[in-house]
Amino acid sequence: MPLTFANVGEENMIKKVGGKPETRKFLENLGFVAGGTVTVVSTIGGNVIVKVKESRVAVSKEMAAKIMV
């Protein structure tokens, strides 16, 4: 399921990062890699705030929809 459907506070394993090659590279540089874990902290406006690799990152809902957990 896309990261946008994950419950707040629930740790999820990243299964796949989709999108264009440059989008995948950008997300991988932020720590979104297959096999890694991600936790949705909150959703504010059009952004999803997540915890990945001990950092909090805000990504747009469009980008979050490309991350499968």
Sequence positions of predicted segments:
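Compact, glycine-rich, soluble single-domain proteins
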Residues: 1-69
